[in-house]
Amino acid sequence: MAMFSWTSSEAINGMYIPSALLIFGTAIVKKEWLPYAVALAAILSGGKVFSNRQRKVLNPTEFQNFELKEKTIVSHNVAIYRFALPRPTDILGLPIGQHISLAATIEGQTKEIMRSYTPISSDQEAGYFDLLVKAYPQGNISKHLAGLRIGQTMKVRGPKGAMVYTPNMVKKIGMIAGGTGITPMLQIIKAIIRGRPRNGGNDTTQVDLIFANVNPDDILLKDELDQLAKEDDGFRVFYVLNNPPEGWEGGVGFVTPDMIRAKLPAAAPDTKVLICGPPPMVSAMKKATESLGFKKAGLVSKLEDQVFCF
């Protein structure tokens, strides 16, 4: 039998010893006081009992400061930024498919600048969130991030966005991503695979991804995507490059309707297409999907749209 000291501060089955002592002592003095003692003990110990539960920290209306914990260089202009949450057990509380806003005051700008990013981490990982960001010459927030030092903070607000993925919302999903447009796709892909029957879920959604980039070095997270495709026969990825290397077996040039027809599911009521990338690419993909029989994408995407643009 496990032994304990009445003066110990360790928890027993979620209740701290002083509370247990209060109940025991009350029961000895007068049994009818016992319910009140139990209630009081619950109040006294509540802070400890609930302190280890996961807490969602995002606020949709107010910016909060999060400290840069790590910075991993991916390429000459791409890095993964890891920001710490207030407590190790905290999670962002970001629905799958949604994104967050980052804000900063940039030198030379009269107003605070805001940009939206989708974390590549999920609420499965507590205590931090990761952002994959490419620094552009004219990108105010991306350049600001690139200049952040470990220990400095970034203002974050969210969640936001019309897309909220739920298991089996459609039978098939086709994805078209360009550059850092891969981030919301990866978030959804990983959620689907986590929810497979073999992992204790019921998600049987089939996913096909076309991922377009300029050069081989621009293919972000390729190793992770390849590993996911290897492990899950319900996920397939097809790479497209403007400047392919010798012996390249993927697509070449821009994403065309013929590529979409060959690599993504055909238009059907139980099929959805997700698009994310540079504005010119998104515009071209809207036209391409419409030409293949998908419903015309709206100016502002809604969750129920057959073609959804992030």
Swiss-Prot record:
Q: Where is the FAD-binding FR-type domain?
A: 61-166
Record has Transmembrane helix as a keyword: yes
As for family, the record states: Belongs to the flavoprotein pyridine nucleotide cytochrome reductase family.
Q: Which InterPro entries match?
A: CBR-like (IPR001834), Cbr1-like_FAD-bd_dom (IPR008333), FAD-bd_FR_type (IPR017927), Flavoprot_Pyr_Nucl_cyt_Rdtase (IPR001709), FNR_nucleotide-bd (IPR039261), OxRdtase_FAD/NAD-bd (IPR001433), Riboflavin_synthase-like_b-brl (IPR017938)
Q: What Pfam families does the database record attribute to this sequence? A: FAD_binding_6 (PF00970), NAD_binding_1 (PF00175)
Q: Which UniProt keywords apply?
A: FAD, Flavoprotein, Membrane, Mitochondrion, Mitochondrion outer membrane, NAD, Oxidoreductase, Transferase, Transmembrane, Transmembrane helix
Q: SUPFAM superfamilies, per this entry?
A: Ferredoxin reductase-like, C-terminal NADP-linked domain, Riboflavin synthase domain-like
TM helices/strands, residue ranges: 32-52
Binding residues annotated for FAD, in chain numbering: 146-161, 172-209
| Gene Ontology cellular component annotations, sorted alphabetically | endoplasmic reticulum; mitochondrial outer membrane
What cofactor does this chain's UniProt record say it requires? FAD
Query: Chief localization class?
Result: mitochondrion
E.C. numbers: 1.6.2.2
Q: How does it sit in the membrane?
A: Single-pass membrane protein
Name-wise, this protein is: NADH-cytochrome b5 reductase 1
Write out the annotated subcellular location: Mitochondrion outer membrane
Q: Which GO biological process categories is it annotated with?
A: protein histidyl modification to diphthamide; tRNA wobble base 5-methoxycarbonylmethyl-2-thiouridinylation
What pathway does the annotation place this protein in? Protein modification; peptidyl-diphthamide biosynthesis
GO MF term list? cytochrome-b5 reductase activity, acting on NAD(P)H; NADH dehydrogenase activity; transferase activity
Q: Which domain of life is it from?
A: Eukaryota
Q: Per the record, what are the reactions this protein catalyses? A: 2 Fe(III)-[cytochrome b5] + NADH = 2 Fe(II)-[cytochrome b5] + NAD(+) + H(+); 2 Fe(3+)-[Dph3] + NADH = 2 Fe(2+)-[Dph3] + NAD(+) + H(+)
What does this protein do, in the record's words? NADH-dependent reductase for DPH3 and cytochrome b5. Required for the first step of diphthamide biosynthesis, a post-translational modification of histidine which occurs in elongation factor 2. DPH1 and DPH2 transfer a 3-amino-3-carboxypropyl (ACP) group from S-adenosyl-L-methionine (SAM) to a histidine residue, the reaction is assisted by a reduction system comprising DPH3 and a NADH-dependent reductase, predominantly CBR1. By reducing DPH3, also involved in the formation of the tRNA wobble base modification mcm5s 2U (5-methoxycarbonylmethyl-2-thiouridine), mediated by the elongator complex.
Subunit-structure text: Monomer. Component of the 2-(3-amino-3-carboxypropyl)histidine synthase complex composed of DPH1, DPH2, DPH3 and a NADH-dependent reductase, predominantly CBR1.
